[in-house]
Curated annotation (Swiss-Prot):
Phenotype upon loss of function: Mice show a higher level of histone H3 with acetylated 'Lys-9' (H3K9ac) and/or methylated 'Lys-4' (H3K4me), display severe developmental defects and die within E9.5-E12.5 stages.
UniProt entry tagged with the keyword DNA repair: no
Presence of the UniProt keyword S-adenosyl-L-methionine in the record: yes
Record note on domains: The ANK repeats bind H3K9me1 and H3K9me2.
Residue list for modification Phosphoserine: 97, 104, 193, 285, 294, 298, 403, 465-466, 1257
GO molecular function: C2H2 zinc finger domain binding; histone H3K27 methyltransferase activity; histone H3K56 methyltransferase activity; histone H3K9 methyltransferase activity; histone H3K9me2 methyltransferase activity; p53 binding; promoter-specific chromatin binding; protein-lysine N-methyltransferase activity
Residue sites binding S-adenosyl-L-methionine per the record: 1101-1103, 1138, 1165-1166
Biased composition (Basic and acidic residues): 83-95, 252-270, 302-312, 332-343
Record PTM N6,N6,N6-trimethyllysine, positions in chain: 239
Protein name: Histone-lysine N-methyltransferase EHMT2
A GO biological-process term: regulation of DNA replication
Domain called Pre-SET: residue spans: 1025-1088
GO cellular component, one term: nucleoplasm
Amino acid sequence: MRGLPRGRGLMRARGRGRAAPTGGRGRGRGGAHRGRGRPRSLLSLPRAQASWAPQLPAGLTGPPVPCLPSQGEAPAEMGALLLEKEPRGAAERVHSSLGDTPQSEETLPKANPDSLEPAGPSSPASVTVTVGDEGADTPVGAASLIGDEPESLEGDGGRIVLGHATKSFPSSPSKGGACPSRAKMSMTGAGKSPPSVQSLAMRLLSMPGAQGAATAGPEPSPATTAAQEGQPKVHRARKTMSKPSNGQPPIPEKRPPEVQHFRMSDDMHLGKVTSDVAKRRKLNSGSLSEDLGSAGGSGDIILEKGEPRPLEEWETVVGDDFSLYYDAYSVDERVDSDSKSEVEALAEQLSEEEEEEEEEEEEEEEEEEEEEEEEEDEESGNQSDRSGSSGRRKAKKKWRKDSPWVKPSRKRRKREPPRAKEPRGVNGVGSSGPSEYMEVPLGSLELPSEGTLSPNHAGVSNDTSSLETERGFEELPLCSCRMEAPKIDRISERAGHKCMATESVDGELLGCNAAILKRETMRPSSRVALMVLCEAHRARMVKHHCCPGCGYFCTAGTFLECHPDFRVAHRFHKACVSQLNGMVFCPHCGEDASEAQEVTIPRGDGGTPPIGTAAPALPPLAHDAPGRADTSQPSARMRGHGEPRRPPCDPLADTIDSSGPSLTLPNGGCLSAVGLPPGPGREALEKALVIQESERRKKLRFHPRQLYLSVKQGELQKVILMLLDNLDPNFQSDQQSKRTPLHAAAQKGSVEICHVLLQAGANINAVDKQQRTPLMEAVVNNHLEVARYMVQLGGCVYSKEEDGSTCLHHAAKIGNLEMVSLLLSTGQVDVNAQDSGGWTPIIWAAEHKHIDVIRMLLTRGADVTLTDNEENICLHWASFTGSAAIAEVLLNAQCDLHAVNYHGDTPLHIAARESYHDCVLLFLSRGANPELRNKEGDTAWDLTPERSDVWFALQLNRKLRLGVGNRAVRTEKIICRDVARGYENVPIPCVNGVDGEPCPEDYKYISENCETSTMNIDRNITHLQHCTCVDDCSSSNCLCGQLSIRCWYDKDGRLLQEFNKIEPPLIFECNQACSCWRSCKNRVVQSGIKVRLQLYRTAKMGWGVRALQTIPQGTFICEYVGELISDAEADVREDDSYLFDLDNKDGEVYCIDARYYGNISRFINHLCDPNIIPVRVFMLHQDLRFPRIAFFSSRDIRTGEELGFDYGDRFWDIKSKYFTCQCGSEKCKHSAEAIALEQSRLARLDPHPELLPDLSSLPPINT
């Protein structure tokens, strides 16, 4: 193999043949003897079976001898059957053939063997014979319907049979009738069968040919044509497949029982309460536990009373900057600010001494912040945040640079607003406690400072007019769950450096006394006092699990959840919803709360603290926090341990039914995560879509090439931005070798980018300059998830790149077993596909030592005998890599140990040259011959370094071979590597372990029937009945399948279990006139031999054929191929051992003679217990005189089992005088013992002829 250049040697299909018995002079089936006056045998198909040999009237294309019953025998019934089964247009010719008027036997037309034209009325009358005692006259041409048996004559030996010794189905010895003079093999079958649907339909096959051929019969009379046109159209009976019911009820969607949609009723939307009640609910500073209990019990949400205002008034009151949206921080983990007033209020708490010390620095910083604000407004269009304030946006910008728990700068100073701002606190007076904490109102909306978001205390007007005025300026207060306030030492000191969180657990309030690590304060909204929290509750606060209305953590019980994003859940109590103008909104994000889901969280799933002992009351709640319980006095509460806890998982993260975020492209497409498998890729895509949806996109211009570069870098956000800018996802540039962005995404393994590109219209099967598809890129780069995603979306798995490689080649090369399994599971890949070097996937796997891949490929039908361009098989490559384990697997799969490549090297040569000791020992133990020489005259011993381990092994094997060279038992040796010489799909080797007989060479191997004289076969393509299927011809509407009664092949190309093996029907495969693909399932025989066979020398029957693999039942084996000759030519042939009768009716019939031209089937022997059956098949033409004979397995065939079929009794009636059957079966009927027993039985019955039954009136019955 010379370092094994890229090319591998071809091992062709194994051959087998029929062996002659011992003592026989001729070669072939049964070893026919040559002798004077000896009759010759003919292989023939079964006689007189309606489904096999349809009787056609004279005048049709390729007509058999007409066989119609005489007058009075029911011609009308046959005509009626024909009319019922034949389409309109053919009925006239049928009636013209059968006759519409009663006709005597003298006027019946008779077939002319020399012409295709029907005999006219002046033709000689057909001779009739009397059958039985009924005296019914039957034309001689109809004898095949009744069955003819050879006539027994008395002579030497007691039983001399004259005539044809036809190989046919098993039948009882005949007592009368004429006997043919040739020994023909035929298909076995019963006697007369009633006309079947297929036999009557077959009468129409040649009518288009008869219509268009020059030798067509006469035109029907006008009267006959007119009579047929007046008849109603007769429909063919078709078999249909059951269809699923259209009324099948839809499968109900399964949802968790505890998750239910909470929708506001019409009464809630339209209900009216007094303004005092609404204001009291909003500003109540009393005990909230009682209020919560009442709200939870009733389940009602009370809305504020107010008349709906027109849109103009709303715009005037609220302003242009008011907006409700969910901030992208929930996805990208950036710090979010929800209220400007909180930041500025914190700044107000700095002492006056600190302000004086830092005044100069803060003035300089103010000027810098104003410049940044102007630049940001110009760039982003002054887009406001939830409060619409630019000051809030500045604070957010500063906090983004820090960690999620950010401590604001101590240098931030309180700015003077353009108008006076009143501090909000208890009675409007600022104090030092938490209850005296002061906030600035939302200046951007110019809301009044008191009465809107602050509690109703003394000194504040609470009359109706005041409330109505405040309602007009009311805005939705949003949460501040993701904001931190500066350290306030007195709050943490007052709490004893313990967590101040209060949890709502099944209607009970439980406190947490875990130690705090940070002193920065947090709160869910401005209605709740600031508090210090432990790390577990800080994490839950960021997840929006703290209700902004009451400040309690929603831990266990029944709550409402708002889902602005697929993975974000805002929890709050039903009584704490935000209300505005008769509508309810989420207190976290301001989304419509009527679509919120009501969820029930069991105790322990939401981070419920362990119950401990009662502890003193906590001080986080102030009098200025509406909706919170008054905790100024000590209260008995159960507290948990102070150890930090892990942030609890969202119990609804996997149960939320949402399609997620989406974006609409300029071309009308939609970008979303729907259809993307769960995983990091889907999460990244959802995050990018939310960011893109929430942020204002900048007007940027991109070059089409930039999309490829961004995809290659994995920049998902930029890719989405470019697709929204209407960049072409199928743009191909010469600089990237015509690769599309989808190629780059598949190469990188980014399934989320592949998803958005395909949604934007990318071609999943686009090819680059090397004809490589994106799926190939994913396979080559070993990205299984991308490959699985593309296969699910219809990526082509069988396309080939420039060098002929397929996806399976690359998967086998890299050794990814899951990838190989994925590709094979599609059923669309060719496991034996060869690239430009002739290498198959199993060769690549053998070269790269992927034994698991090799085992999988072998189970899927990989052929180990295929060779590359240098005639190397996969065993050569296994020996080149030195893998003894792979070599043993291949040898167990019947790989040829003695295969030679272009240089004459065997696998042993290569293993010895590379000094692979294990491989050399394996090959020697399996019988490798170390004396074989390559083209340079070297043996394996010559290629081995002297005195190496391999050298000693070869020396020892040589001595052992010399010691056993004279043993009596012979071993099989390959005498020909392929008797087909490459004409078949698989090589057929020839072996001999019996004698010194060489490989048979007295014939010419052909793979198709040939002709040595003109046969006038109708090959006109316009005469072919064909289908118009666009699928794989699996439906019942396929015309070719209807001609065969049905399509008899399954998806694996095997005969169905219900196929009649005793009387096989005609099979019409799809032909070149059909509209279906060449790969449709109704093309089996025309695809050639696919099973591995071997021609071997038998002990008693000469050459035989055996299987080199397990063959399932119904598998196509091979076709009986030979020379097409007429019956008259067969009578003058010297050797009749290879004749196969194409039709067992008398008259002008034809045969296949495989004596001088044939294939492997000429060596198949007779078996009384056969394992294969012959079937008539039509493919390239539909001339019924010339069917093709295909052999199918009638049962499962084991590896090494000999193949054989039943030649038929007619064959043995002639040949039994010269030799007997040697099959050795227990059911053998033609052995010497069986013949002796039969002769003894007949001899006992001869002295008593009265004991014999009178069978003269009964037609013969074939068995």
